[in-house]
A protein has these predicted regions:
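Ligand-binding loop in jelly-roll beta-barrel domains
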Residues: 70, 81-106
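A generic beta-sheet turn/junction motif
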Residues: 28-30, 52, 91
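A short, N-terminal "cap"/entry segment at the start of jelly-roll beta-barrel domains
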Residues: 1-32
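Short, well-ordered beta-strand segments in beta-rich or mixed alpha/beta enzyme
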Residues: 36-40, 60-62, 97
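Aromatic/pi-system hotspot detector in well-structured domains
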Residues: 60, 75-76
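Conserved short histidine dyad/triad with adjacent acidic residue
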Residues: 19-21, 31-51, 70-73, 80-84
Length: 106
């Protein structure tokens, strides 16, 4: 795949399961890592779940809550694969950079 470079301003914001997403580096059927910017509104309420891959969130704006703990801009959250977490909320809205490694069942 080589080198991929993208500017956030060149990527469309699309509606996704919970909020809106800018897919900076989309995964190819789970065979490659992915990076995205997620925009979550105050109505975001993602139930407890887990993934068969590691993931990280970096809070860019606003505030998000995971497992009842609030994280504000500048916070980096690492979640190991197969770790149940949630609910995930953004009571005042939030914008996060999300990285997920390549893994099964994405």
């Amino acid at each position: 795949m080589g080198v991929i470079a993208v500017n956030e301003n060149d990527v469309k914001l699309v509606k996704s399961g919970h909020g809106q997403t800018k897919w900076l580096v989309p995964s190819k059927n789970g065979a490659s890592p992915e990076m995205m910017i997620r925009h979550w509104g105050p109505d975001t309420n993602i139930p407890v779940h887990s993934h068969p891959y590691h993931e990280m969130f970096y809070v860019l704006e606003g505030e998000i809550e995971i497992n009842g703990v609030a994280y504000t801009a500048g916070a980096c959250i690492y979640i190991e694969k197969d770790t149940p977490y949630g609910p995930t909320r953004a009571p005042k809205g939030g914008k996060v950079l999300r990285y997920a490694e390549a893994g099964p069942s994405k």
